[in-house]
């Protein structure tokens, strides 16, 4: 769920096609760990 939330935050922030690195950066900014396996699915 946190991956989807981070993806949507990036999208709402103006990034029309957030990458896995963008999502990972958002999660790292709040101290959450990114599951690499699920992150690659995006």
From Swiss-Prot:
GO cellular component, one term: cytosolic large ribosomal subunit
GO biological process, one term: cytoplasmic translational elongation
InterPro entries the UniProt entry points to: P1/P2_N_sf, Ribosomal_P2
Gene3D superfamilies given in the database record: 1.10.10.1410
Modification after translation (UniProt): Phosphorylated.
Residues spanning the membrane: none
Superkingdom per UniProt: Eukaryota
Keywords assigned: Phosphoprotein, Ribonucleoprotein, Ribosomal protein
GO terms assigned for molecular function: structural constituent of ribosome
Family, similarity comment: Belongs to the eukaryotic ribosomal protein P1/P2 family.
Primary role: Plays an important role in the elongation step of protein synthesis.
Subunit note: P1 and P2 exist as dimers at the large ribosomal subunit.
Protein name: Large ribosomal subunit protein P2
Organism for this UniProt entry: Triticum aestivum (Wheat)
Lineage: Eukaryota, Viridiplantae, Streptophyta, Embryophyta, Tracheophyta
